[in-house]
Amino acid sequence: VAPNKPMTLVVAAVVVLVIGASAAVLYGTSNADQYVSELDQVLTEPDTPSVVIECGTNEERHLNADNPVVSPGIPFGAHHTHEYVGNKSADARSTNDSLAAAPSTCEKGDLSTYYWPVLRLTDRTGHDAHADGGGLHGNTGEVLKPKSVEIRYEGSPVSAVLPMPRFVRLITGDPSAFTNDHGPNTRARWGCADKPGRYTTKYPLCGSATTLRSYDFGSCWDGNNTDSASHRTHVVFPLVGGACPPRTFPIPRLHVTVGYDIPAGRPFAIDSFAEEMRDPATDHAMFINVMPVALMSELVRQLNGSR
């Protein structure tokens, strides 16, 4: 028996290599460990009043490689492609005035813009294979259309909320999470519709269930500013338990959930900066509040009245 052991080890090693290579091919990346079947994190959130704003699923395919929050005035400044719902004019040239004058896909007169990186099937050729934000920046594949988009505003679990200031700009998540070693701004949350309350920072393999991307934004405002150099310090996240840090004030908490039907076994990945290697932990989203003051006041009334 002993003479056969080396051959057994060789065969086993070959099998492992073949399986690993197959996974890499299947998922369109050399980082096959970015894909998981188990959602290893449990979501625990307090029950709070909420209001949903219907904004569609980007049926008109409003896509661009701009970022009006982080890189205003710079066409293709995102170096990856964003998907938008809400304000139909949002791009690098957007100003407060142009956004306030534009139409929107949202109901109730909400002119806000909500956007995040596109998700792609990487075994297909994309429409932008030779364009900025697409193939020229390493983001290859066919853009997947969302099955669902939920825009939800939530109240505070511990107090009444104040209205969001109009034209406040927010970002959640870290588009540089990979090179930042998954630091404190990483807030990627991937899940499956058939596993509520569980999530992962990796790509989930949901089988026939809808794949979900969720974004929670900060909800503690400094009381003065609609933006900051980092696009983060003027509105921060609440403390454990839901109270805002000192010298900040509770505003409605924006929660966005995007769902996709991904055929089982098909490779997929989000857009990212080239150096971020399309790591799922780099998922992020941006928002500019362009709600008319009266609509925001009514939203706050509903959130506070349900307490």
What are these regions (language model features)?
Residues 1-14:
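N-terminal export and membrane-targeting signals
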Residues 28-79, 83-215, 222-307:
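Primary mode marks residue(s) on the alpha4-beta5-alpha5 output face of response regulator receiver
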Residues 16-28:
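Hydrophobic alpha-helical membrane-insertion segments, chiefly the h-region
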Residues 8-11, 21, 30:
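N-terminal cationic amphipathic segment used for targeting or macromolecule association
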